[in-house]
Amino acid sequence: MPEAPTIDGGNTVWLLVSTALVLLMTPGLALFYGGLNRAKGVLNMMMMSFSAIGLISVLWWFYGFSVAFGTDVNGFWGDPGAYLGTKTFMAETDLWGATAENPSGIGVPLYVFMAFQMVFAVITVALISGAISDRAKFAGWLVFAFGWATLVYFPVAHWVWGGGIIGGDIHALDFAGGTAVHINAGAAALAVALVLGKRLGWPREGMKPHNIPLVALGAGLLWFGWFGFNAGSELTVDSVAGLAFINTQLATAAAVLGWLAVEWIKDKKPTMVGASSGAVAGLVAITPACGFIAPWASVLLGIVAGAVCALAVSLKYKLGYDDSLDVVGVHFVGGWIGSLWLGLFATNSVNAAITDVVGASDGLFYGGGVTQLGRQAIAGLIVTVWSFGIAWLLAFAIEKTIGFRLKPEAEVEGIDLAEHAESGYDLSLAGGSGGGSAFALAGIGTPAGAAGTKPASDESEPVSEKVAG
């Protein structure tokens, strides 16, 4: 008689807590992006993140989870009808990973795993918004988010984690989303930024962060929630979850030091924006590697990622693309660093699943040669090309139909007022309706975005200011 399915209380509670932690990351991202942005666009910046929670959650329940984690059809997507939203699953019997030989799987109800992966999809879409602040119509953003999630994120999640071509055939490693989340979102961010073009006045006018305490608060919430993102991706309560947890902390802390070192050397002044951005860069880089490398390699990864990303944010000035809040410089570059790091430092001495389950190889410095490094590079290239190409086509089509780029006069007025009829701050001297010098000082309704701004150039712009615009 086959064994009856049994829920594992420890695994289920851990994944529920991790889901809540990852959900918290999107409001944290809204605060982080909102603080980095100019005051006259802070609410729109936050709206793009909060709208992603609403839209992507429903899409994931209805068909996204099926496309990502349904039975593999051809290596490119899962069976769309496998977990269609019209179906109902029993918590006591429908357990994730269950097989005839192991009817309990990991002992976690299917709906818990669905919710955990749902919040990954949400924040991946929200990340893209940082590249197009102040100039994207809200309706255009919603259409783009719908199309990109459907055509890119859901299939790519299947390629990486659902038994598709990257995880199942190429045997590339990605513990929590370096390829599926960060390279994916970063490539899309670059494409949309190119289609929409530069903000008015960029880079001649300084576009500094309007609220640095908000940036720090958002970074802190991201750091806190990322423990669920990374350690939760083990799905079970075991030693690998502990490894992912400590590696996340070590890499992030080291990345703060790496970013600040670059600021200190280049600009002679370490900044709070730099520390916050360094933390995010470290979190991004450790994401694919947290459960596959030793702690010492995580520290080294953090230092490298913090320093390289601090330098990478300057590329937009040299190459002329307006990635407003440095999604490319932090998420795309950081995702690539972390993914390739696995080809050097992955070892089954800390996680036997590397060879026993995934079918991957140890990294170069653990005797595996360059095999895994090549696999990681191929996986990253596939996702980069697909995400960039589809995002560019979607953004171009939206611009030519309903319009994606905000009108110049609306951009000058401020996207919060133009698109949402509200502003983040009531700074009028009378406490009332709007004009006045206090608004100008806050960058609301002024072309330059702030009083007293200075011209920017790639030679003179401090690293901390490049992060913000």
Language-model features: where?
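Glycine- and aromatic-enriched membrane alpha-helices
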Residues: 1-469
